[in-house]
Amino acid sequence: MLKMETVDKVDMIKNHGLTASENLEKFLKRIEAKNDDINAFLEVRGEEAIKRAEEIDARIASGKETGKLAGLVIGVKSNINVEDFNVSAASKTLENYTGSYDATVIRRIKEEDGIIIGMTNMDEFAAGSSTETSFFGPTDNPAAPGRIPGGSSGGSAAAVAAGMCDLALGSDTGGSIRNPASHCGVMGFKPTYGAVSRQGLLDLAMSFDQIGPLAADVSGISLALDVISGYDPADPTTLDSSPDLEVERELKGLRVGVVREFLEVTDEAIDEVIQGKLGAMEDEGAEIVELDFGYIDLCLPTYYLINYVEFFSATRKYDGRKYGHRIEDVCGSEVLRRIHMGSYISQKELSGKYYKRALQARSLIRREITGLLSHVDIIAGPTVPKLPHTLGEELEPMEMYAYDVLTVIANLAGIPAASIPAGDVGGVPVGLQLQAKPGDDGMIVSAMREIASL
């Protein structure tokens, strides 16, 4: 059952070939057997999920309409509000905070009969790339045991990779969906900025953050995007129209940009896997177009300067007065460092020296990457330039940040991007990143569908 295409499973549930309760039961057993070792889920609400599945089954049995996600089991990153669930952001700051409402994406999932099974682990307040900074302990990588699953949505990626749910939601600020998708050998999608409502998300950096799905197959990504995308009056950053996910393009004639600088910063073993996948695409008729990107060295400093300032602003509400603890009193070292850096940069006398220059650099990067995309249909390359390290291995901050060098570009530019499995290096998964013009989310989904069949 776990290998069944997600869209086929929905059809099977709707047509009496499988009940929502049976689907849920297998995932609950899987979670019970595996989660103590993997630590993908921080909270599982089995009883509520069982009631929800029974309601869906009763409606199907009586011939009533059911939604696009009927009976699918979904995990949710712990920084997205779900009513009556623990929304901790994997921090002691909010360890006992219970969501009082559903985020827009959760409401839409429930309206389409998706079943929320629980909250997944993550880096504390999404500030990390390994899911090791969680107050509740690290998450293991089911696809490469003993290594990090990536982050910050590592629990969501691990849950999908371990077969604990059909779909999972993550948030992506600088690669936090795509990075763990790559490391765990699953698919992850960061939508165009504004395509999906952020209402109900605990922000890391509001001008970068996007909620998106992780899944084991392309149909799961497409189904989830179809449900969660669209204008939301509660989030003024959302776009008026949803992306067209019905795009169908064969690889034959598809213009695929390959950026030389992206490959130059990538480990040789990963590069070989990526080149193999690009070669397979070319064999199917894709046109490979070599491109140059002149601002690769600007991307990480630009991203982190803006990230620090926006994160500092976002964390001022965690003062311990209304709920939880004062963040500076209980948070981990990475969160505290980002707060201190954001405070320093935000000081009036320094804003022109760092933050304003970072905004100018962001404009340069956005113009450069969108300019390159005007010549091709998609840009393809490695998602992450190096393999995931061993759990517990000590890395300097800049070594950790290096995981993000190829993923932050999409967040700086607001463009859609995804990671799809490309192969492995010694059994460790490697992801192929696809990027497209703003609003061309459907082009990426179409390309993912074609690449997955190679």
UniProtKB/Swiss-Prot annotation:
Domain of life of the organism encoding this protein: Archaea
Keywords: ATP-binding, Ligase, Nucleotide-binding, Protein biosynthesis
Listed GO biological process terms: translation
GO terms of molecular function: ATP binding; glutaminyl-tRNA synthase (glutamine-hydrolyzing) activity
Reaction(s) this enzyme catalyzes, per UniProt: L-glutamyl-tRNA(Gln) + L-glutamine + ATP + H2O = L-glutaminyl-tRNA(Gln) + L-glutamate + ADP + phosphate + H(+)
Top-rank EC class of the record's enzyme: ligase
EC identifiers of the protein: 6.3.5.7
Disulfide bonds: none
InterPro entries: Amidase, Amidase_CS, Amidase_dom, AS_sf, GatA
Function: Allows the formation of correctly charged Gln-tRNA(Gln) through the transamidation of misacylated Glu-tRNA(Gln) in organisms which lack glutaminyl-tRNA synthetase. The reaction takes place in the presence of glutamine and ATP through an activated gamma-phospho-Glu-tRNA(Gln).
Assembly description: Heterotrimer of A, B and C subunits.
Name used for this protein in its record: Glutamyl-tRNA(Gln) amidotransferase subunit A
Lineage: Archaea, Methanobacteriati, Methanobacteriota, Methanomada group, Methanobacteria
